[in-house]
Amino acid sequence: MGKRKEGSYNFDKNVQMFLACAKDDNRPAMECVYFKGDWAYASDGHIIVKNRISECSNLDEAMIQALDGKLLHSLFFKDMLKYDDILISDDGIECHKKNDKAFFYFADDNLKYPNAEKVIQSYLAKPSVP
């Protein structure tokens, strides 16, 4: 990961998961990055990206747990990467860079993200073609 100030937290700016998200008003959950356990998922319905949060960020365990089950819109994820430091709350992510602050709310709790892990495992279980 790139250099960070001591005590600042964020995702690695090279991990641009927002690029894998759908741009589809009919499937708003797919426009989001989904956090489950120590994993972050993004999909457009054709491809799925899965990254271990503890490897693509410098977030501590409490911050990773606070993300569990949350959806963050892809545009918010993209903008979040522009900041030096993030704080995670129940409602969203507060971002800081010098005197600039922003708050990105998590997506509506009524949105349901598809079971990406089930899709990945079913694909991996298929026999390979020689």
Report the location of each language-model feature.
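Extended macromolecule-engaging scaffold surfaces
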Residues: M1-P130
